[in-house]
């Protein structure tokens, strides 16, 4: 598949275009090239993330989808899904493209359900942990990450009571 075929299918935004041209370089080299071109940081960061996520596992497993989305943010994850879909369509790999459409539908379901994807959306905050007697520092971060991981796997666990009962061992 040639670059032209990829570019024809993709949206006009620069992030998609640069991603299509530079994805084979990997994230580190893509970011270096874009910095040399003196592009804005937003374009550089988003293109780097798009390239980094290229080739992600295609899945119908909601917990894995939540983990993938959590790793880059919901807005970026939507961009990645669109990029991957157009990439596979340009490569005439309809099976992967259709699987990505299913994955996108599941992701929309996740968003509609209001599932927690970030620490900010977690029912417990760092201040809650401090009030519970945990000393500020790495331990709070580790506990919050553990809680988020649990909630990404099982969204129903995103309640203060459940998270305190199952993650705080004071």
Language model region names:
Residues 4-170:
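C-terminal subdomains that position terminal phosphate/3'-OH groups for nucleotidyl transfer/ligation
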